[in-house]
């Protein structure tokens, strides 16, 4: 989608549709809109005064111009209460415009800027509008032979602004927003791909593509490499699958004078059957998405490579399958992790944490000074927080506060769960150092704290995205399927750590 600033007066724009944002409770129009309203015989004023249009957030009303102005249609867009407008409101409202315009087959759309009158920086306005537009236009229909998206959506989106002094800032924001959206779309595509296409090898190939696009250092560890490193926990999970596992390591050094290296670790189960502890058949198809954490990390590295923040980042992804077979690991087995700790296996469907701990150890060996891991880790997270909020488990409250701010910038919701010492007692084994599932209850917390046993005291945050990695329906700038959650939050977190 092409998006650019236009300084023409709104009533003079030649477009399939023009969009006018109106706050809830608005009683009168500004001078620019009054002039256009006169040409439309006062219909906008009539819609507002009669309360046929109230301006609630996301409310729309389409008016046909009938040739009285060059644009064919006028869409009134409710901005909600003026005091409630935030950065993410801009994304949601721009997404609403793109979807409504597509529904009425408008290819060229012009709209008034959202948020400038609220004091939101022009660059940030441009960024959020671009994110909302691109993410709303996203579709995953590559496997359809009919009814595919054939470019019928918005092709050109013009932002109307008469203050030329801020146009460069708006356009810079467009560029940033496009890169943030692109990384998110990469993650969405990875999550949406079927597991017969997105194998661990295919995921490694995508990582190589991302790294090559941005000149990033990348290495792929094969099974033999992992055996030499003693990754018995990771490799134990992979024993039942015919697909070879891959450990993907991408390095970005944006500030070589800074000793801080942020480690981003993603769970990349391209399919999780549960292994010997087999999952129920109903819903097992969704387990192609059990690599949402890996997708977020790879998408974030695409954004980091494109926008080049002055930080250092190591991204580690453990890509594999969890399948049952005569060679698969079993309940009752004991695995030895890369750092030497032993784990009693009580349930082979608690496999993601076994992959992650060796990836975390590898990240630390590569120099990471703090860790953020992402995983579709526990069904308990969905029970606790539904499909709205990502759960956090951490050993560092200051780091969590940085995460809260980053998530707010991205428009994503996160919430820290408690990590009291009593919870750690639930993952102690009678015959090994740890067991891979805790006693009954607190499943998300105990899974997170299991990972925390391997961070060696470094600042660490675990993000359980089990409930947020998939959007259950089309809403706002989300489409049903992979959400791309975590990509933009990770970027904003990394960016906030610039020195």
From Swiss-Prot:
Entry keywords, A to Z: Aminopeptidase, Cytoplasm, Hydrolase, Manganese, Metal-binding, Protease
GO function terms (MF aspect): manganese ion binding; metalloaminopeptidase activity
Cofactor remark: Binds 2 manganese ions per subunit.
Top-rank lineage group of the source organism: Bacteria
Gene Ontology cellular component terms for the protein in this record: cytoplasm
InterPro entries per record: Leucine_aapep/pepB, Macro_dom-like, Peptidase_M17_C, Peptidase_M17_leu_NH2_pept, Peptidase_M17_N
Main subcellular localisation: cytoplasm
Active-site residues (renumbered): 279, 353
Residues engaged in binding Mn(2+) 1: 272, 349, 351
Cellular localization per UniProt: Cytoplasm
Enzyme Commission number(s): 3.4.11.1, 3.4.11.10
Pfam families found in the cross-reference section: Peptidase_M17, Peptidase_M17_N
EC top class named in words: hydrolase
Record GO biological process: proteolysis
Required co-factors: Mn(2+)
Record's catalysed reaction(s): Release of an N-terminal amino acid, Xaa-|-Yaa-, in which Xaa is preferably Leu, but may be other amino acids including Pro although not Arg or Lys, and Yaa may be Pro. Amino acid amides and methyl esters are also readily hydrolyzed, but rates on arylamides are exceedingly low; Release of an N-terminal amino acid, preferentially leucine, but not glutamic or aspartic acids
Residues engaged in binding Mn(2+) 2: 267, 272, 290, 351
Disulfide partners: none
Protein's job: Presumably involved in the processing and regular turnover of intracellular proteins. Catalyzes the removal of unsubstituted N-terminal amino acids from various peptides.
Family as reported in the entry's similarity comment: Belongs to the peptidase M17 family.
Protein name as annotated: Probable cytosol aminopeptidase
């Amino acid at each position: 989608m092409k998006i650019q600033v236009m300084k023409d007066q709104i009533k003079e724009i030649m477009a399939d549709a023009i969009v006018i944002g109106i706050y809830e409770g608005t009683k009168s129009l500004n001078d620019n809109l009054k002039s256009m309203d006169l040409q439309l015989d006062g219909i906008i004023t009539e819609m507002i005064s009669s309360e046929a249009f109230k301006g609630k957030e996301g409310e729309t009303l389409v008016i046909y111009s009938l040739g009285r102005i060059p644009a064919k249609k006028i869409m009134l867009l409710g901005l909600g209460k003026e005091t409630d407008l935030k950065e993410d409101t801009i994304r949601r409202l721009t997404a609403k415009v793109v979807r409504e315009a597509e529904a009425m087959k408008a290819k060229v759309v012009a709209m008034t800027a959202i948020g400038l009158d609220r004091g939101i920086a022009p660059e940030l306005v441009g960024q959020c509008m671009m994110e909302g537009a691109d993410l709303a236009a996203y579709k995953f229909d590559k496997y359809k032979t009919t009814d595919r998206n054939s470019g019928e959506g918005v092709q050109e989106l013009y932002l109307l602004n008469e203050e030329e002094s801020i146009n460069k800032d708006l356009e810079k924001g467009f560029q940033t927003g496009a890169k943030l959206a692109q990384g998110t779309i990469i993650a969405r595509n990875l999550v949406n791909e079927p597991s017969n296409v997105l194998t661990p090898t295919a995921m490694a190939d995508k990582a190589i593509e991302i790294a090559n696009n941005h000149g990033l250092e990348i290495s792929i560890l094969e099974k033999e490499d992992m055996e030499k490193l003693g990754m018995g926990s990771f490799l134990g999970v992979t024993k039942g699958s015919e697909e070879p596992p891959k450990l993907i390591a991408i390095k970005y050094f944006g500030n070589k004078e800074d000793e801080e290296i942020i480690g981003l670790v993603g769970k990349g189960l391209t399919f999780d059957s549960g292994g010997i502890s087999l999952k129920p058949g109903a819903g097992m198809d969704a387990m192609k998405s059990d690599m949402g954490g890996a997708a977020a990390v790879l998408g974030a590295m695409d954004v980091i490579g494109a926008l080049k923040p002055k930080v250092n980042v190591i991204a580690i992804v453990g890509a594999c399958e969890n399948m049952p077979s005569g060679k698969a690991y079993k309940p009752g087995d004991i695995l030895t992790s890369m750092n030497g700790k032993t784990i009693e296996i009580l349930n082979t469907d608690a496999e993601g944490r076994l992959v992650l701990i060796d990836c975390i150890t590898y990240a630390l060996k590569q120099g990471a000074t703090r860790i953020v891991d992402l995983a579709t880790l526990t069904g308990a997270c969905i029970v606790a927080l539904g499909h709205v909020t990502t759960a956090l488990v951490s050993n560092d409250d200051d780091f969590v506060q940085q995460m809260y701010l980053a998530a707010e910038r991205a428009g994503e919701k996160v919430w820290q769960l408690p990590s009291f010492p009593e919870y750690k007692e639930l993952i102690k084994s009678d015959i090994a150092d740890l067991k891979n599932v805790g006693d009954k209850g607190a499943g998300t917390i105990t899974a997170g704290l299991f990972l925390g046993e391997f961070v060696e005291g470094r600042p660490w945050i675990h993000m359980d995205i089990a409930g947020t990695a998939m959007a259950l329906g089309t809403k706002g700038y989300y489409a049903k399927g992979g959400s791309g959650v975590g990509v933009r939050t990770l970027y904003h977190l990394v960016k906030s750590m610039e020195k």
